[in-house]
Amino acid sequence: MGSAFDPLVTATEDLAAVNSAPPLSNLTQEELKKIAAYKAVEFVESGMVIGLGTGSTAKHAVARISELLREGKLKDIIGIPTSTTTHEQAVSLGIPLSDLDSHPVVDLSIDGADEVDPALNLVKGRGGSLLREKMIEGASKKFVVIVDESKLVKYIGGSGLAVPVEVVPFCCDFTRGKLEELFRDSGCVAKLRMKIGSNGEEAAPAVTDNRNYVVDLYLERDIGDLEVASEAILRFPGVVEHGMFLGMATTLIVAGKFGVTVKDRFG
């Protein structure tokens, strides 16, 4: 299938492309995000428990679900928000909400991603909600990931942007140093994420929804076996979770200049 995603699919011949729309070359990135989000909501059925994602793409899916509820095209939906930001959006739109304690099995989660590699491994959580996202999306029967084509990479960390790691505040610089050392061969630079004050200066460490800090890993080269890397990160005392979502996505929806492409992990 002719799409901008094709050059990256060398490692994913098992994936099935199930749909492609006409070219969208004149649309903005924000419009592409909205198109991908609306396509994902086509997977939602009445009576489902839905994981509501976080971020600039997922917000369009949340808004679309609300719209369909108001129109009566969806009924009896329960949303499980992945962040306080999404919780606030869903409440404002009148979507009924719950949590994993009350609904431990989620029928479908819809969320964006910061990076997607050819095997549908993801980087998520650059917005700081990675722990809640991973808990809810890990409890989901299906996990639909929605991106525009700018998020497609050849390897995790390949965009040059951060792979986030949530850490406890206690001795966070010690943890930061250990993480940097772990991936030194990949040219890793680990930085504690800081909030920017009103004067444009770094004011204080950025805090997650769970009152933890974030260490951002910037990688110059591929870190190799992702499962090995994941286990190594999580072995460090002080690490809460990382933003690599490995083998979790069941469907990828990509909106790009060649149209909308849906790829299913299991064909």
From Swiss-Prot:
This is Probable ribose-5-phosphate isomerase 1. The modification N-acetylglycine is found at G2. Catalyzes the reversible conversion of ribose-5-phosphate to ribulose 5-phosphate. Its EC number is 5.3.1.6. Pathway: Carbohydrate degradation; pentose phosphate pathway; D-ribose 5-phosphate from D-ribulose 5-phosphate (non-oxidative stage): step 1/1. InterPro entries: NagB/RpiA_transferase-like (IPR037171), Ribose-5P_isomerase (IPR050262), Ribose5P_isomerase_typA_subgr (IPR020672), Ribose5P_isomerase_type_A (IPR004788). GO terms for molecular function: ribose-5-phosphate isomerase activity.
